[in-house]
Regions:
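Short amphipathic alpha-helices in soluble, non-transmembrane regions
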Residues: 73-81
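Generic detection of long, well-ordered alpha-helical segments
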Residues: 12-16, 63, 67, 147-154
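Helical scaffold of the NTase/Pol beta-like nucleotidyltransferase catalytic core
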Residues: 1-43, 158, 164-182
Length: 182
């Protein structure tokens, strides 16, 4: 579970290049993955929303990959110069089939940007379409914050909990990207 947010930092934005570089690889993976975590919340949010850091997490890209699509996903990542990165989780006994791939991009102003993709190999993930993207079904996604996701304090997560409690579909709801009043 994530630490409480520092409310003084609520107006901070994700750099546009981070969104751009992530979307570039996601487009090539679109037909063979299910988006999870921050990118699922991103596509549930209204179009052209402000990319507040506390609305949803764009530090990495969390994906679910059906076992039958793993080879294709790995080929796409390798063709796009992503490399396998070993993590401490690779050595731990787990039911999760987890893989991390990273790529470092040098921007025009010579800043290094790391794009990290965490993917979990699993079939039968409840999912739905949002703006042409396959995303983890929000009610199922909320349950992942107890084991594979950690940004449970983001506004999108907190808003979706409330919306689903009222049987309201979270798709395109402003609450997902609105700075909380309290």
């Amino acid at each position: 579970m994530g630490a409480p947010h520092n409310k003084k930092r609520y107006g901070e934005l994700w750099p546009s290049y981070r969104i751009q570089y992530a979307l570039e690889i996601l487009v090539s993976l679109k037909d063979v993955v299910i988006l999870s975590g921050g990118w699922a919340w991103h596509f549930l949010s209204p179009l052209n929303h402000t990319e507040y850091k506390h609305a949803h997490d764009h530090k990495d890209i969390d994906l679910f990959v059906d076992p039958k699509n793993v080879a294709e996903v790995m080929n796409i990542l390798l063709e796009n110069n992503f490399q396998k990165v070993w993590t401490r989780y690779d050595q731990l006994p787990s039911d999760e089939n987890f893989r991390r791939y990273e790529k470092t991009i040098l921007t025009e102003d010579e800043k290094s940007v790391r794009v990290t993709i965490d993917f979990f190999v699993k079939s039968n993930i409840p999912n739905r379409m949002a703006k042409g993207w396959s995303i983890v079904e929000p009610s199922y996604l909320l349950g992942l914050y107890s084991n594979i996701h950690s940004s449970d304090k983001c506004w999108a997560v907190q808003s979706v909990i409330k919306l689903l409690d009222q049987n309201i579909d979270p798709l395109d709801r402003e609450e997902l990207v609105t700075i909380p009043k309290n």
